[in-house]
Amino acid sequence: MTTPLIELQGVSRSYCQGDATVNVLNDIHLRIDPGEMVAIIGSSGSGKSTLMNILGCLDRPSGGEYRIRGRDVAQLTPDALAALRREHVGFIFQHYHLMPELSAVGNVEIPAVYANRPRQERRRRAAALLDRLGLAGKHHHCPAQLSGGQQQRVSIARALMNGGEIILADEPTGALDSASGKEVLAILTELNRQGHTLVIVTHDMAVARHARRIIEIRDGRIVADTRTDQTPLAPPLLPCSAHPRRRRGAQFADRVRESLHMALKAMNAHRMRTLLTMAGIVFGIAAVVTVVGLGEGAREQTLRRINFLGTNVISIYPGKDFFDENAGAIRTLVPADAVALARQGYVDSVSPELGTSARLRYRNKSANVDVIGVGESYFRVRGLSLAEGRTFTSQQVAQATTDAIIDDNARRTLFAATGQSPLGQTLLLNTMAVRVIGVAAADTNITGYHSDRIHIWLPYTTILHRLMGQQHVNGIVVSTGAGIDNAAAERTIEQLMLQRHGVKDFMLFNDDKIRRSVMKTSMTFSVLITMVAMIALFIGSLGVMNIMLVSVTERTHEIGVRMAVGARRGDIMQQFLIEAVLVCLTGGLLGVLLALSGGALFSALAGDIFPMVTSWPAVSGAFLCACAIGMVFGYWPARNAARLNPVEALSSE
């Protein structure tokens, strides 16, 4: 005796409704051999649809045994059941259950997508099946463009896509007119002659008479099993042979590509909802990139503005502290202190510093200038550079020469009209003639003075003896050597100055402390604003989760159809995860573009007040963040979709 294709022994199915248990199927014994055409007939509520769901591995029996080719279905995992549906079973539904956003070919090839068949191969087979069923020229029509009979033919082609050894037809003519119904029944009869095993579920005896065997079910029990045709069965269709095994990488890439294609179709079908979902991500990512860019711009601007402080610089000024009202009357800070400091091993360079104001003239041009007296090491201590010329030598300082270095403001004010080089030119500083030997770079910042004023540097000895007639200086700047602990050097300098002065009539100003304090404040400010932007991004992420949950609810029926044609739980989860990630990545891209374009416009309008620097690590991080958001906030909706019961999903409309 041959092994039956389908065998049920004592199968029952019950459901819990509150505290009560409802028995839908009771003690079903059924055997269907390969190549049979069976009609299961019964009135509404008789249990015939539940029986079909169990036969199609969409549902599990509560009791008894169900075997397909001797394989106990009860022992199979959800993914194994999906494989069984995918490889052996094809469904034909009363209402077709086609994907509205896919073409006829796209709908037919869905089972082959989950069977990991190559794209070109499944396209060829889908087209051939449609041609065979009289739908040549309709390959790229969407379901809405097809009649009911044509849609049912597409459904039949889908059932045959992976072989269709067993075809389960649930009221296949229920939604068709009589002519289309006859055509569909003729197709099903022909498929049975070709060896397909057919099970038709119907309430219409006229439809049931087309089968060789009629099984009547009433109140969950089989009450009649009649053979209407005793002619020999056609040779049964052999199980669909396994497709050549493809590399895992190729399978994965193909599945991702198809999931991406389906995600794009779903997004396009709900464009407004997709745009609203993206909006939260767009503005969240734009906020993060903009804030980071503005923070980076502010940081660089701050660095430029405090760059004049130099590296490891300690400044000495008269007075016990910045609040000493008598600081202006203290005359004890003298050039000899700078000489003593220069002899210390931890000191790299030293320069006295003092300033005054004067009137500078060149030919018919004149301007008020800030005059700064410095030593030969001043430009080294402050880290300042020259655009042209040279700095002072120790000999020029010792001899109190009238050599001068001007800034770029002076060059533009006095020499821009003539276009000549300032080097070697003689200027009149009040009544003293000075010769220009250098021009400071345009981006030079001068400590303690306004950058929009004109500055001129002379040897401090020249200012002391020729301009001001005094012996004390306004300050001394000290640069410690590389690798020297700046805090320890500060303490040692304080001890040396106390020994020289006998009292603490000076104060120390450690520029590195200021630099670190400014940078720390800037960093703290950036972190705080970034956190605010991240909160906005998080809120947008919750929107993604919310919309994806809504999407799962709206597309429950679609999920059921995909499961019916063989989609694994992993396939469903991957589908919705990719959709969530795609939404977030697209939103991330738009957010970055919005931030860059908006930042450029903002910087152009605000100028140097609020500069924005594009931080490519931040841009890269934004994309990674968008991807992570899609995966994290899309996981729960995707998981919910993957865990849906196929029967419940299919019954959802």
UniProtKB/Swiss-Prot annotation:
It is an enzyme of class 7 (translocase). ATP binds at G42, S43, S44, G45, S46, G47, K48, S49. It is found in: Cell inner membrane. It comes from the Bacteria. The chain crosses the membrane at residues 275-295, 525-545, 576-596, 616-636. It is a multi-pass membrane protein. Coiled coil: none annotated. InterPro entries: AAA+_ATPase, ABC3_permease_C, ABC_transporter-like_ATP-bd, ABC_transporter-like_CS, MacB-like_ATP-bd, MacB_PCD, Macrolide_Exporter_MacB, P-loop_NTPase. Part of the tripartite efflux system MacAB-TolC. MacB is a non-canonical ABC transporter that contains transmembrane domains (TMD), which form a pore in the inner membrane, and an ATP-binding domain (NBD), which is responsible for energy generation. Confers resistance against macrolides. This is Macrolide export ATP-binding/permease protein MacB. The gene is macB.
